[in-house]
Structures are given as C-alpha cells and as structure tokens.
Amino acid sequence: MENEATVPAGREASMTETNETRRYLVTGRVQGVGFRWFVEHAAVQLGLAGWVRNRADGRVEVLASGPRQKLHDLYVELKKGPRASRVDNVEVEDAAPETNLKSFRIEGTW
C-alpha cells in the first residue's frame, strides 16, 4: 500500500443509501501523469471507498464502492483525467463488493 486517504467527515455514504461496487479500466496516457493521485483525490471528495493502481499493460484500474450517483460522478472525472493525461476509454463493469473497503488508497502496479 503506497498511500491511503480517509474519507473526510460528513462525506461518508449514508447508511440508508445502497452501495454498489464498480471496476473501471482507463486506457490512454494515464501512467506517469499523476492519474492515481487525481483519482484518489476525486474518490475521497466523493466519499467513495476503494483503490486505484497502475497495470502492467499501461492501463489504470480503479475499484470503487459507494452510492450509484457518486460512482457516476467518479466516472465523469475519470473521463476527464488530470491535465497531463489523455483518456482514450473508460471501461466500466459491476464488481463484487469487498467488505474490507473503508477508505480509498493508491496501490502499486499489478
């Protein structure tokens, strides 16, 4: 685990909201441009839990859990990316929930 950020007070998902989990695969110029830090910041601001990591194939993988609207908001941010990046595609799929997700963290290359 390289870095871990906790969800700011007041940004936690409401216990009455149903959380969903999504896996995103981001393709383009997304490594070496601060993309993981960009994703971590966006996810924490949205109150999401999960992780982001570089993949050996050049893509960035994101697993995020939270309310459906917040996951959509993250998707919008992923399509933008940080200034130095170029996002060509964002694949999205439902993922099995991971019960140990309490915060959002940056992981190493996988």
Swiss-Prot record:
GO terms for molecular function: acylphosphatase activity. SUPFAM superfamilies: Acylphosphatase/BLUF domain-like. Keywords: Hydrolase. Residues 21-108 form the Acylphosphatase-like domain. Pfam families: Acylphosphatase (PF00708). It is an enzyme of class 3 (hydrolase). It catalyses: an acyl phosphate + H2O = a carboxylate + phosphate + H(+). Its EC number is 3.6.1.7. The active site is at R36, N54. It comes from the Bacteria. Belongs to the acylphosphatase family. This is Acylphosphatase. It comes from Koribacter versatilis (strain Ellin345).
